[in-house]
Each structure stands twice: as structure tokens, then as C-alpha cells.
Amino acid sequence: ADIVDRNDIWVNTRNMVDIEFFKKLAQKYPKVNLVWQPDGVVNGIASINAFYRDCCDKDTIYMKLDDDVVWFEPELFEKMVKFRVDNPEYFLVSPLVINNALSTYLLQVHNKIKLDKYYMSICGERTICFDGWFAADLHDWFMEKYLIAGKYQELYVGKHPMGMARFSINCVLWFGNEMAEFKGEVPGDDEEFLSCIKPTQLGKANCFFKTDI
């Protein structure tokens, strides 16, 4: 998308096949930029937190996408950046993410999906977060009923602020100047810190913008 100035790939792996693939991408696409682990330590999810120190440029909006996101709707970047700019009061903003526990919760309470029982609004809920069979069924449900049919807009549920609660940061946007205020120092679990601890310390909410998938 033209609105994207740079595509950073966080190289948090020792797998040489993956690294060579990343290098080929950077050679082929001028916008691709490889970011190496700032401390030179690669330890899976435990070494992700250091990368945020390089996400503090002022006058910049950062959008973090997990590497297992396989589809997003046309104009996702434009719509989410506009929402981010129009709603500066939130710390993080996120679109609707299929197979994200709190996104599933919103689909449930807005009667967009019928589940076998009521599931609570908990990021680590045993079924809607950790059950692989549930995840597979959810993806099939989305693809067969909404994606292939071109009806995914029917799942939009609007704007939902939230606070003092963890959520999966599969796709989130923040302002570089806000991250710069604490130098991008993210201790421990980046998801717990960025979705719950830091916004709570700042007295801010996060917001789901569920008019984008």
C-alpha cells in the first residue's frame, strides 16, 4: 500500500532458511527493511520485547502484524491509519482479527456467531484462545460463509474501547512519539505490557475498530 513507507521484518530467528528468505525479500522490494534483534539475543517470544526500542520515531504511526496473519481486507492500512489519527486518545488500536479471543467475544455478543455456550471476555480463555479445533472451525466458518461469499462486511461491529485487560496484539497500531516517551522499553511479555500494563499506567484505554478485518 502506498500509505506504508517501510515494511520492517523483525528477524527473531536463527533459522538460516528464514533469514535467507528475508534477505531476498529485502533485495527485491525497496520498502522491506530487516531489523535484527537489538541485543543480539534470539529466544523466541522472550526476545521480541527489545524490538520496540526501534519503533519510537516521532510523526510516525507503527502497525505491528503477526507473521501468521494470512489475509486482510483491501484498504486495511488506509482505514486503520485514519482511525488511528482520528482517535489519538487510545494507546493501541486494533481491527477485528479472526481467531483473536476478544474479537471472537465481540462477534458472540453482537450475535454474529453462534457458539455452543457463552464464553467470557478473557484473552486466555481456554476454548476461544487455546483450542486448536475451535481455531480451525472458526477459520472455516469465516472463509466459507463470509470471505469466499464476499460478505465479510456483515461481521463489522463498530468501535469498542477497552481498558485494564489483556488482548492478543496480532495487529495493533501506535504512535511513535508515545512509544518514545518510555524509549520503547518493554519489560517481559510484550503483549501483557503493551495491551494492559502501560495503558493502565497512563490512564488510557485501547480500542477495537471492528469495521475492518
What are these regions (language model features)?
Residues 1-4:
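Short, acidic, metal-binding catalytic loop of nucleotide-sugar glycosyltransferases
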Residues 6-11, 24, 28-29, 97, ...:
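Long, low-complexity intrinsically disordered regions enriched in Ser/Thr/Pro/Gly
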Residues 12-64, 70-76:
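Active-site-proximal specificity loops/subdomain of glycosyltransferases
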Residues 14-16, 40-42, 68-70, 98-101, ...:
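Short, solvent-exposed loop/turn segments at secondary-structure junctions
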Residues 21-23, 75-78, 106-108, 185-186:
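Short coil/turn segments at secondary-structure boundaries
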Residues 79-180:
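Conserved catalytic core of nucleotide-sugar-dependent glycosyltransferases
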Residues 176-185, 203-213:
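Active-site donor/metal-binding and catalytic loop motifs
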Residues 187-196:
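Acidic donor-binding loop at a coil-to-helix junction in glycosyltransferase catalytic cores
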